[in-house]
């Protein structure tokens, strides 16, 4: 299975650092976030990687090269203008092939074991969900006892999308080149009953601010 890492964002909330450094190359305890993800993927047996980029993307290519230094292979999908999540994945589909692939947000840190991920026959997506963080208390989806993902419920019990998933290329059938979001495609597939999920109860941080980067460094220090 191949993996795609989304690395095209500008990292607005991490300014001024991201004015000169793309967010995936920001270091946590001396190692760039994206390098930590690639090493975790390799440990899980996933060593064929696709990375999209836009803002300061040449720095990402210069640092990671062809991936051989990390024990894998990297194909890049550069974007002249950011295409949002859905458009970026759609542009990269020729590099990903016709089989399901792993998808990771480039600014997430987690102890999730990627080797556990799979997509059941007939499903279009499998989402890893986490407890709602303080900055996103309402959550994104509901996970039922059978492992099926549904829309959020007013009664509560909702979870947050972790930025870790398995997608089938068929999710993008009918899409056209250009910028578009991933969420509407997922919600359409959810309505069709074709999205599964799991609840990761381990460590997970969406490294979107300097404060959350400090949290990751604290967690890494605890396990050093």
Swiss-Prot record:
UTP binds at residues 11-13, 23. Its EC number is 2.7.7.99. It is an enzyme of class 2 (transferase). Its cofactor is Mg(2+). One of its GO terms (biological process) is cell wall organization. Mg(2+) binds at residues 107, 206. Substrate binds at residues 105, 140, 206. Keywords: Antibiotic resistance, Carbohydrate metabolism, Cell shape, Cell wall biogenesis/degradation, Magnesium, Metal-binding, Nucleotidyltransferase, Peptidoglycan synthesis, Transferase. Disruption phenotype: Cells lacking this gene accumulate MurNAc 1-phosphate. Deletion of this gene increases fosfomycin sensitivity. Growth rate is not affected. Belongs to the nucleotidyltransferase MurU family. Catalyzes the formation of UDP-N-acetylmuramate (UDP-MurNAc), a crucial precursor of the bacterial peptidoglycan cell wall, from UTP and MurNAc-alpha-1P. Is involved in peptidoglycan recycling as part of a cell wall recycling pathway that bypasses de novo biosynthesis of the peptidoglycan precursor UDP-MurNAc. Plays a role in intrinsic resistance to fosfomycin, which targets the de novo synthesis of UDP-MurNAc. This is N-acetylmuramate alpha-1-phosphate uridylyltransferase. It comes from Pseudomonas aeruginosa (strain ATCC 15692 / DSM 22644 / CIP 104116 / JCM 14847 / LMG 12228 / 1C / PRS 101 / PAO1).
């Amino acid at each position: 299975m191949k993996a795609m890492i989304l690395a095209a964002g500008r990292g607005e909330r991490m300014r001024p650092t991201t004015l000169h450094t793309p967010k995936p190359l920001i270091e946590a305890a001396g190692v760039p976030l994206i390098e930590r993800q690639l090493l975790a993927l390799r440990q899980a047996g996933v060593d064929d990687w696709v990375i999209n980029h836009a803002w300061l993307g040449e720095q990402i290519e210069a640092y990671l090269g062809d991936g051989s230094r990390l024990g894998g292979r990297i194909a890049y999908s550069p974007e002249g203008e950011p295409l949002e999540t859905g458009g970026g994945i759609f542009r990269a589909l020729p590099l990903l092939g016709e089989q399901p692939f792993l998808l990771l947000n480039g600014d997430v840190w987690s102890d999730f074991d990627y080797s556990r991920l799979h997509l059941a026959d007939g499903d279009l997506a499998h989402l890893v969900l986490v407890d709602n963080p303080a900055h996103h208390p309402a959550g994104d989806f509901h996970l039922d006892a059978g492992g099926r993902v549904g829309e959020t419920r007013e009664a509560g019990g909702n979870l947050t999308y972790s930025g870790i998933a398995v997608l089938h290329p068929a999710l993008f059938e009918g899409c056209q080149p250009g910028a578009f979001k991933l969420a509407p495609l997922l919600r359409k597939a959810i309505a069709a009953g074709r999205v599964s999920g799991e609840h990761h109860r381990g460590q997970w941080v969406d490294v979107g601010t300097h404060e959350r980067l400090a949290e990751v460094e604290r967690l890494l220090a605890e396990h050093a």
